């Protein structure tokens, strides 16, 4: 089955073609970072308009790169949520229109299921069951995964997601957007030990997360530096390092607990923050100590992309799932409500 995947949940327009026998044939992506950078964050209306502008050129690009024709496509998968409603509607309406014109089925895909399954596109994909750490700008969750659609949320953030905390901390330090890569860049030259941030909710049982306090701690630290006249670039680097260390160590502690609780030794990390090299290195060390395995997608499939949507949609289309005639998207969508395959 050849599936066209469309991703428009936020500020990236992604289009890909995935074949159930041959694998990923082509993928194309347009990032709106430059469009939103001057505003310090995503402007939903601008995001929606740009998705409209980019969709068909990207579709032509993947068809040209793959050598496929529209008549070869057997189904269309698109991100139906969670995400920005206006942006989601662009992808959903495009998918439904093309499906009607081409006489093929369409299916809305859960954005975070796409992220969770992105490592399946690699040469050595994980085997079920495993624990997944989904860590992005909008989500931080630990999930037990026994199969596609067989998800048990073990713990999640009670306030800011990890990626959101990265972006907000970068903004208060006067750094660019998106904040995650900026924090990671500065942290490389930070001095260990100058600042020590708390590891939130690690002093009690459970697998929940809370990152809003870290953002406040960073703000107070930065304000103290400014008040004392020590607000130069080195202080920014030191705060960035202390913040990143706190987030990474918090995630490591919770992942270790989740693996112990489930008795599993396979961990999948997915979502935009999974591209953070400090986090990857720390997880690899931890899984080495536990004689376990860690899996993640290549960096370009950590952030939003059409390939993960095409893959996830292909699995569900092969199982016979189809959309009805109505276009439905979801700003919020609990992953546990998805049907199991």
From Swiss-Prot:
The alphabetized UniProt keywords are:
Acyltransferase, Cytoplasm, Iron, Metal-binding, Transferase, tRNA processing
Q: Which parts pass through the membrane? A: none
- Where is the secretion signal located? none
Q: Which GO terms describe its cellular component?
A: cytoplasm
A Pfam short name = TsaD
Q: Which GO terms describe its biological process?
A: tRNA threonylcarbamoyladenosine modification
Top-rank EC class of the record's enzyme: transferase
Task: Report the EC code(s) recorded for this entry.
Answer: 2.3.1.234
Major localization class: cytoplasm
Where do the annotations place substrate binding? 134-138, 167, 180, 276
What SUPFAM superfamilies does this protein map onto?
Answer: Actin-like ATPase domain
Q: Give the record's cofactor note, including how many are bound.
A: Binds 1 Fe(2+) ion per subunit.
NCBIfam families (UniProt xref): gcp_kae1 (TIGR00329), T6A_TsaD_YgjD (TIGR03723)
Q: What does this protein do?
A: Required for the formation of a threonylcarbamoyl group on adenosine at position 37 (t(6)A37) in tRNAs that read codons beginning with adenine. Is involved in the transfer of the threonylcarbamoyl moiety of threonylcarbamoyl-AMP (TC-AMP) to the N6 group of A37, together with TsaE and TsaB. TsaD likely plays a direct catalytic role in this reaction.
- Which family is this sequence assigned to? Belongs to the KAE1 / TsaD family.
Q: What is the protein's name according to its record?
A: tRNA N6-adenosine threonylcarbamoyltransferase
């Amino acid at each position: 089955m050849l599936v066209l995947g469309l991703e428009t949940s936020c500020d990236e327009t992604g289009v890909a073609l995935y074949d159930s026998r041959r694998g990923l044939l082509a993928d194309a992506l347009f990032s709106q970072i430059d469009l939103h950078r001057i505003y310090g964050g995503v402007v939903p209306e601008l995001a929606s308009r740009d998705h409209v502008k980019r969709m068909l050129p990207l579709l032509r690009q993947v068809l040209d790169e793959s050598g496929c024709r529209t008549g070869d496509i057997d189904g269309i998968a698109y991100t139906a949520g969670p995400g920005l409603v206006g942006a989601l509607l662009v992808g959903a309406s495009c998918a439904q229109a093309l499906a009607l014109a081409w006489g093929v089925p369409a299916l809305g895909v859960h954005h975070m299921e796409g992220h969770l399954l992105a490592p399946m596109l690699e040469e050595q994909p994980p085997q079920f069951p495993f624990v997944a750490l989904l860590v992005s700008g909008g989500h931080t969750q630990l999930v037990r995964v026994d199969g596609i659609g067989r998800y048990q949320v073990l713990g999640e953030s009670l306030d800011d997601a990890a990626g959101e905390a990265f972006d907000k901390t970068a903004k208060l330090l006067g750094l660019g957007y998106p904040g995650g890569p900026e924090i990671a860049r500065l942290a490389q030259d930070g001095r260990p030990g100058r600042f020590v941030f708390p590891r939130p909710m690690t002093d009690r049982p459970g697998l929940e997360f809370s990152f809003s306090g870290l953002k406040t701690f960073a703000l107070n630290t930065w304000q103290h530096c400014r008040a004392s006249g020590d607000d130069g670039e080195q202080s920014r680097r030191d705060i960035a390092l202390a913040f990143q260390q706190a987030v990474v160590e918090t995630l490591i502690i919770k992942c270790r607990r989740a693996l112990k609780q489930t008795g599993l030794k396979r961990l999948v990390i997915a979502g935009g923050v999974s591209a953070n090299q400090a986090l990857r290195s720390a997880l690899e060390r931890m899984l080495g100590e536990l004689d376990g395995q860690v899996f993640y997608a290549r960096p370009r499939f950590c952030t939003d992309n059409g390939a993960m949507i095409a893959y996830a949609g292909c699995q569900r289309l092969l199982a016979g799932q189809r959309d009805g005639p109505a276009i439905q998207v979801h700003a919020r969508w609990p992953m546990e409500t998805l049907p199991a395959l």
